[in-house]
């Protein structure tokens, strides 16, 4: 019974760490990354579609993203969508391909980004601690309902804390990696 609670908790904590990783993919670093364009939707035959479903995205150089639409008539639509997304860069096109050149980040902007990364990481840690609290509440309910003994409860609480520490360390690791990536010139 305690294993079910702990496995459920691990699965929720893993989702929190994955969510943090996905959130960090959207953050602009000194390098180009197609993940920056993940949220952009373009009107494709009346349906708002993700950019990667109407074009091929590539990173040919560290500071350049290229977008090659499958239909050339989509170029102005894609350009407009990128400009409307207000991501801080301007697309240029040569009739077949859209190029986005990312300007280098200033030191001040890098520090702002790191501050934002730390806040997002702290939010992930709070989510993990809330999951821990829910797991401990679930274990206490099992003990109250006499489904597990007090000793089992204490052992399970220790295991819950150990697992929580592992996932908090994972969050710190993801943050450190992204912080290094952002501060790299």
Curated annotation (Swiss-Prot):
It comes from the Bacteria. Pfam families: RRF. Its main location: cytoplasm. GO terms for molecular function: ribosomal large subunit binding. One of its GO terms (cellular component) is cytoplasm. Responsible for the release of ribosomes from messenger RNA at the termination of protein biosynthesis. May increase the efficiency of translation by recycling ribosomes from one round of translation to another. This is Ribosome-recycling factor. It comes from Geobacter sulfurreducens (strain ATCC 51573 / DSM 12127 / PCA).
């Amino acid at each position: 019974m305690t294993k079910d609670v702990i496995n459920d908790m691990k699965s929720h904590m893993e989702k929190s760490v994955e969510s943090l990783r996905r959130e960090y993919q959207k953050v602009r670093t000194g390098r180009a990354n197609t993940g920056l364009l993940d949220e952009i939707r373009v009107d494709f035959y009346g349906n708002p579609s993700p950019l990667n479903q109407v074009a091929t995205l590539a990173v040919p150089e560290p500071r350049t993203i290229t977008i090659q639409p499958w239909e050339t008539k989509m170029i102005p639509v894609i350009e407009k969508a990128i400009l409307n997304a207000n991501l801080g860069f301007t697309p240029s096109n040569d009739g077949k391909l859209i190029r986005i050149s990312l300007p280098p980040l200033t030191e001040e902007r890098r520090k702002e980004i790191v501050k934002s990364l730390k806040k997002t990481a702290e939010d992930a840690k709070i989510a993990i601690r809330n999951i821990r609290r829910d797991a401990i509440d679930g274990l206490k309910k099992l003990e109250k309902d006499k489904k597990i003994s007090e000793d089992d409860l204490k052992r399970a609480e220790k295991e819950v804390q150990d697992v929580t520490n592992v996932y908090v360390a994972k969050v710190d690791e993801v943050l450190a990696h992204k912080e290094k990536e952002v501060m790299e010139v």
